[in-house]
């Protein structure tokens, strides 16, 4: 569970600080105030911790994070994420399951995050997903082609990770409780079910 999360100098957000979060939290604000950027930053950090030392993953955490930020925000250099005109760095501090993870970088940063510290010695034992505003089921093949084969900007990592997660067939005995409950609640709320035809992509 996220115990604490703060960001300094991310785009329009000079300071965002959350403490004492519950299992479900709501972020409300008018359009154009940087809500999505904050959530994408949180997602990129959590997904990087999830990937770090997972299986035979050889890369250092800061390398995984830098690449995740690049493909999530789709910027030519990481320094573009820093609030324009600010002399101080973009800084992120996260306390997750009582373990700390923090990093920072300035406007001149290209692709490498040098200043970072983490209490995580193994991968974060959870899965996170970001559900973007656009519908992805019918675009899944285009998203995979654009990113996996052509390595082009257009669909950021939030889309790609969601499509990959949806592609994984459910394994016998691996019907996670949270997902099962979520599907049941959605079915009750919508009075129906989602049926996806892999052959037609609809």
Which positions does each model-derived feature cover?
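Pre-Walker A-like glycine/lysine-rich segment at the N-terminus of P-loop NTPase domains
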Residues: 1-47
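Phosphate-coordinating catalytic segments in nucleotide- and nucleic-acid-processing enzymes
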Residues: 6, 48-202
